[in-house]
Amino acid sequence: MFDLNGKTALVTGASGGIGAAIARALHAAGAVVALSGTRKEALEALAGELNGRTHILPCNLSQKDETEKLVPAAEAAMGGLDILVNNAGITRDMLFMRLKDEDWDAVINVNLTSAFRLSRAALRGMMKKRFGRIIQITSVVGVTGNPGQGNYAAAKAGMIGMSKSLAGEVASRGVTVNCVAPGFIESPMTEALTDAQKEAILRMVPAGRLGTGADVAAACVYLASAEAAYVTGQTLHVNGGMAMI
């Protein structure tokens, strides 16, 4: 099950923890993986770790021109694109009354608009071959909201609404569009928390632990697979029960 041999995948934000975990999991399932991100050294290190069946495609998704070249570059490198994982994201947290226009715009641009552009670019090839998987990495806060993250929550909620709309347009052509919404995931940020802060977080999570990149990646492998062909327009929450939605 969940065999991705012969499939090609593009993962954005692959120079970060969750993106790298997703790339590893897709690669382990047999896919050829294009690794995209802003930190070329991290992408090269990941490609070296995976040791074959990878392509490095650095891209700054805040730049429209770079974003619009990414899918064609991935298709050229791999001979097509079967799986798109829009994982890249940034934060510019601030209380709403103090949130600057430029910080709102930056988060919406990278987290939502780039996902729109990449999804749109990938559709033609996917629809032609009558197979495609578009997976958006959203967040639990896109459903619940979170004080101080109005811009981030809006972008992630926008991804969910966009994906539902797109899923209805392309389902008959063998293309599925789904979201994965992580909760609290282990990261350099969570490692810097005090014990008291970690305990407060864990009290919110019935599973009693933080999630890992591998937890998120496993959901992506499922949604990318042939076994998930009848699943579209959905949001798969990976949060240890923190929000039962």
Functional labels for PLM-detected ranges:
Residues 171, 176, 231-233, 239:
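Short, small/polar-rich loop/turn modules that mediate ligand/substrate recognition or access, typified
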Residues 119, 155, 163:
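Active-site helix of classical SDR
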